[in-house]
């Protein structure tokens, strides 16, 4: 069996590692460096440069030098509008509202650009090993959604790699950190702030098991954003002095970016740095120079919003894991941006202890990926990695409610099925609306896919049984299947790369879910009550029709009166009136049921009201057919 390499496909830099003699080795590239800039350049004559050669020529070729492409992976064009405005290269709206990089009229997908970086990493490994490499473990941010994971897998395939596993970056880092400590019981927090993304994961380690308890983060918070606060400050200062916005010139913008990144790095070890850019731009025919001093204090002031944005995800992750900061034994720093002193200070403040500096933040993720590769080949034994899915998943059901099938922070791989039914007689088709998020109502969550199940046999409402199955594999990629149990017909969907969530949407969902939890609960209870009334009306009318004149006249009149009252309350959607009418109807039905029971005789097994007679005692009664207590009433749309 060939080697499985581990690749950290980063926003700013990438790294490749391989297991040699049970030891992970970080492989040096052809330029003699252990990390490779995630930069691709297209130069005259059709030549393509990747890594350091591409980065070195960026100032003179800004519109054809592509960087931070990871931020575009699996996103729609609308979701990356902020990034489109920031970069000097041209990004246009492509098919299916996807972002495409325009190089002289040739449109490249983010997957294609990422594949070029992966090819560089593949070649680096092949040069070191002296053999062809065809398989890899590739890491992604823990908070990457299904579409972004799928896009990463596609990039690997384009690069000629069979992606054996997609692993979350903090989880890979924990594997590298804890492999030699696997006999100890530990609780660790992995704080991963890279070039473009931020993740926080809480894990338990012990007896070779690495179990993720919770994860949180922001897929658009990283070193790029820290660079941009410096860029904006430099540009605004220059504009106030010279009346010209340097951000409008691609070459000047590229010089600002490099200067900002250099200043940020220097301020991790010094209290101030001079930014000197001669001949930055001519103003009225006169060459102008940019010379400014940036102190660490000023930088921290400029970046304060970004620094504080790291706090809430950490607090949420601790809460979701059922832990307090005192429960955490070690805090591991991952990603180059964790070298910023203010970040280290905020981490210590959040967790109440100084973070461990025992791992290389630039290399530890790739090392963990290589170890996972060794687990897959059998070279590494007695290690079990248990990861989680970051967001809840479900479908839209009657009344616009999101019915969850898989909760956030569920260990993967996982599979969950539920039975649903129809709300219309003789409904031939249903539409399955797949949702992702934490809110109770469908409209407040993110729609990540829709598909139809056709060919349902004609039947009264609530009779068909549609089994919906959510299946998340070890890569965190979702498959949804709908199965009509009567006809055997099946339909499924794999969520495609353009349908995922943006970082802002994820953040908004969780914040709003917390702030509106009580309102959501009340609204859901209201909808549930209306649905119960609807089902009770249906079941009562069905029983009246089936039993006909078997009802004693003196018992039927109260039922008719209560039924009319319930219909009026249901039409008005008055919850209090519904409660009263349902209670009256249930009383009338019970009285009629007793009379029928006496008349028919228990021994004869006559027309007796079953346990669901007029049913509407709770969510599991009137909502469902009397012969199957596991069927949920769903307001599917009829597809004509």
From Swiss-Prot:
Instruction: Using the record's annotations, give every residue carrying the modification Phosphothreonine.
Output: 197
Q: Where is the composition biased (Basic and acidic residues)?
A: 626-640
Coiled-coil ranges per UniProt? none
Chain residue ranges for the region called Disordered: 600-640
Q: Which SUPFAM superfamilies match?
A: Actin-like ATPase domain, Heat shock protein 70kD (HSP70), peptide-binding domain
Q: Name one Pfam family in it.
A: HSP70
UniProt keyword DNA repair, yes or no: no
- What one GO molecular function would you report for this record? ATP binding
Q: What induces it?
A: By stress conditions e.g. heat shock.
Q: Where do Gly residues bias regions lie?
A: 603-617
Q: Which UniProt keywords apply?
A: ATP-binding, Chaperone, Nucleotide-binding, Phosphoprotein, Stress response
CDD domains (UniProt xref): ASKHA_NBD_HSP70_DnaK-like (cd10234)
Q: Does the keyword ATP-binding apply?
A: yes
NCBIfam families (alphabetical): PRK00290.1 (NF001413), PRK05183.1 (NF003520), prok_dnaK (TIGR02350)
Tell me which PANTHER family the record gives. HEAT SHOCK PROTEIN 70KDA (PTHR19375)
What is the similarity comment for this entry? Belongs to the heat shock protein 70 family.
Q: Which purpose does this protein serve, as stated in its record? A: Acts as a chaperone.
Protein's name in the database: Chaperone protein DnaK
């Amino acid at each position: 069996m060939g080697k499985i390499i581990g690749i950290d496909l980063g926003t700013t830099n990438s790294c490749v590692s391989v297991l040699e003699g049970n030891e992970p080795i970080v492989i040096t590239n052809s330029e003699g460096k252990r990390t490779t800039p995630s930069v691709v350049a297209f130069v005259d004559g059709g030549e393509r440069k990747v890594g350091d050669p591409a980065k070195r020529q960026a100032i003179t070729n800004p519109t054809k030098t592509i960087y931070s492409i990871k931020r575009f992976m699996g996103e729609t064009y609308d979701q990356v509008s902020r990034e489109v405005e920031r970069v000097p290269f041209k990004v246009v709206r492509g098919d299916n509202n996807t972002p495409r990089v325009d190089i002289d009229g040739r449109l490249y997908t983010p997957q294609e650009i990422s594949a070029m970086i992966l090819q560089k990493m593949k070649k680096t490994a092949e040069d070191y090993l002296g053999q062809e490499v065809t398989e890899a473990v590739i890491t992604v941010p823990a908070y990457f959604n299904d579409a972004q994971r799928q896009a990463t897998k596609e990039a690997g395939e384009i690069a000629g790699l069979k992606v054996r596993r997609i692993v979350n970056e903090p989880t890979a880092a924990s594997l590298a950190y804890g492999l030699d400590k696997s006999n100890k019981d530990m609780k660790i927090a992995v704080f991963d702030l890279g070039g473009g993304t931020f993740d926080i994961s809480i894990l338990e380690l012990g007896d070779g098991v690495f179990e993720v308890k919770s994860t949180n983060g922001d897929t658009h918070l990283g070193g790029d954003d820290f660079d941009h606060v410096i860029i904006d400050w430099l540009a605004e200062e220059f504009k106030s002095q010279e009346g010209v916005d340097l951000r409008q010139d691609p070459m000047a913008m590229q010089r600002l970016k490099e200067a900002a990144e250099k200043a940020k790095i220097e301020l991790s070890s010094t209290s101030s740095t001079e930014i000197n850019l001669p001949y930055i731009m001519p103003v009225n025919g006169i060459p102008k120079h940019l010379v400014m001093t940036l102190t660490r204090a000023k930088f921290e002031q400029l970046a304060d919003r970004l620094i504080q944005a790291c706090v809430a995800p950490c607090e949420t992750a601790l809460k979701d894991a059922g832990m307090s900061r005192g429960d955490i034994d070690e805090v591991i720093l991952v990603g180059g941006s964790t070298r910023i002193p203010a970040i280290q200070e905020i981490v210590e403040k959040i967790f109440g202890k100084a973070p461990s500096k025992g791992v290389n933040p630039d290399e530890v993720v790739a090392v963990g990926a290589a170890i996972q590769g060794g687990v897959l080949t059998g070279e590494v034994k007695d290690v079990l990695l248990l990861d989680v899915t970051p967001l809840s998943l479900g479908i839209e059901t009657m009344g616009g409610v999101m019915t969850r099938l898989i909760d956030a922070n569920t260990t993967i791989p996982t599979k969950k099925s539920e039975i649903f039914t129809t709300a219309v007689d003789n409904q031939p088709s249903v539409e399955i609306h797949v949702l992702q998020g934490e809110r109770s109502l469908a409209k407040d969550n993110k729609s990540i896919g829709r598909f139809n199940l056709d060919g349902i046999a004609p039947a009264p409402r609530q009779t068909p049984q549609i089994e919906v199955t959510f299946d998340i594999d070890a890569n965190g990629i979702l498959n949804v299947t709908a199965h009509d149990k009567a006809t055997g017909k099946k339909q499924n969907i794999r969520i495609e790369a353009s349908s995922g969530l943006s970082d802002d949407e994820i953040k908004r969902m969780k914040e709003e879910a917390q702030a509106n939890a009580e309102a959501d609960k009340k609204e859901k209870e209201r909808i549930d009550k209306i649905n119960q009334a609807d089902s009770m009306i249906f079941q009562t009318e069905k029983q009246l029709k089936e039993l006909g004149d078997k009802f004693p006249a003196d018992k039927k009149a109260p039922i008719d009166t209560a039924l009319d009252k319930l219909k009026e309350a249901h039409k008005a959607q008055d919850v209090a009136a519904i409660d009263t009418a349902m209670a009256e109807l249930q009383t009338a039905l019970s009285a009629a049921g007793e009379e029928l029971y006496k008349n028919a005789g228990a021994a004869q097994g006559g027309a007796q009201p079953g346990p669901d007679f007029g049913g509407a005692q709770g969510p599991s009664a009137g909502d469902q057919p009397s012969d199957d207590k596991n069927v949920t009433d769903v307001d599917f749309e009829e597809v004509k």
